[in-house]
Amino acid sequence: MIRQEVLHAVLDPKAVHFKQFWLSSVDRDESELLEVLCFGNYGDLNAIQSCEEWKDAIESKLRTLTLLGLCEVPSELEYDQAMASCCIPDDVILEQRMVELQAQVHFQLDSVGRRIKVLRCLGARDIYNGERPLLLLRDAARSRESTLAGLRQWKQKLQYQLR
């Protein structure tokens, strides 16, 4: 049984962090849903077997979370890449989704060039640190190890540029 506060968070368009719910979850269906919301992407939507009555809300949330994840790294994002990752059918819907992320991401849309220039990403997706076993996902794209590896690469790049 999915807790009411979890459902409210899924339905809240501004909510992007679900790890606190995942860590305290004891229900298998709820844990699977929260695992995908925390660490999965739009492509993992079909892994969730329960929650049919909220499928549209969950699908919408995963699109938003996947876009946020794409904005964490690059300074420029092609429309085609974002649309393919989130299964978004047209430019207008993509631009609407980006506007929904304004509190998390500062960006400029280039509708003609079909690019999103990420100026600053204020939010980030949840990070998996092995707190409990994953039930559905083979591995989490954003884990402690991958975050540390990215920081080490960034440090080396900065050190190289300063030489």
From Swiss-Prot:
Residues 5-120 form the PCI domain. Its main location: cytoplasm. It comes from Eremothecium gossypii (strain ATCC 10895 / CBS 109.51 / FGSC 9923 / NRRL Y-1056). Coiled coil: none annotated. This is COP9 signalosome complex subunit 9. Component of a COP9 signalosome-like (CSN) complex. Component of the COP9 signalosome (CSN) complex that acts as a regulator of the ubiquitin (Ubl) conjugation pathway by mediating the deneddylation of the cullin subunit of SCF-type E3 ubiquitin-protein ligase complexes. The complex is involved in the regulation of the mating pheromone response. GO terms for biological process: cellular response to pheromone; conjugation with cellular fusion; protein deneddylation. Keywords: Cytoplasm, Nucleus, Signalosome. It comes from the Eukaryota. Signal peptide: none annotated. GO terms for cellular component: COP9 signalosome; cytoplasm. It is found in: Cytoplasm; Nucleus. InterPro entries: Csn9_fungi (IPR016806).
